[in-house]
Amino acid sequence: MIIIISGPPGSGKTSVAIKLANELSYKFISAGKIFRDIAQSMGLDIINLNRVAESNFDIDKMVDKKIHEYVLRERNLIVESHIAGWIFREYTDVAIYLWAPLKIRANRIAIRDKISYVEAVSQIIRREYMHYKRFNKFYGIDINDLSVFDLVINTSNIDINNIVKLILDYLSSVSHNSQPLKEKNINDK
């Protein structure tokens, strides 16, 4: 089974995806980690690489290509990504969207990154604005349209263990088509 975990910065998607992958003994791939690795190799931070990516679709294509390779190769995989739910939906069995209000996400990011709450809010707003523009421009998707997701969870008042339990309960309650996934070249988009 291939499962997508999407959501905005600070929603808990990476933590949940890692824990879920461990619970299921699935492989895990993170678009955010791939993006951060690209930023580091270019000597940039995430915000500045997002700025570069606004005019250079090759950045997103590199991330997408790496994820696409995993999706076609692996049978038991958790994909963590802001936009995988939209662009890889046809290849996956279940798409889950995690979210929380801005103030909660900012608090989580401030603690995680050891920055002020105000700086975390500023970073989130900048990243989300850049993501919205870029993903609409290059992919033609509206990241506010959550209709592609099977399950949407507000992570505000649920701890990680209960979020994972909720997802596991959902997974056990649905049946999936086990036919092989079709190959498609995502670079044709």
Curated annotation (Swiss-Prot):
Its main location: cytoplasm. It comes from Saccharolobus solfataricus (strain ATCC 35092 / DSM 1617 / JCM 11322 / P2) (Sulfolobus solfataricus). The gene is cmk. Belongs to the cytidylate kinase family. Type 2 subfamily. Coiled coil: none annotated. It is found in: Cytoplasm. ATP binds at residues 7-15. One of its GO terms (molecular function) is ATP binding. Pfam families: Cytidylate_kin2. This is Cytidylate kinase. GO terms for cellular component: cytoplasm. Gene3D superfamilies: P-loop containing nucleotide triphosphate hydrolases. Keywords: ATP-binding, Cytoplasm, Kinase, Nucleotide-binding, Transferase. Its EC number is 2.7.4.25. It catalyses: CMP + ATP = CDP + ADP; dCMP + ATP = dCDP + ADP. One of its GO terms (biological process) is pyrimidine nucleotide metabolic process.
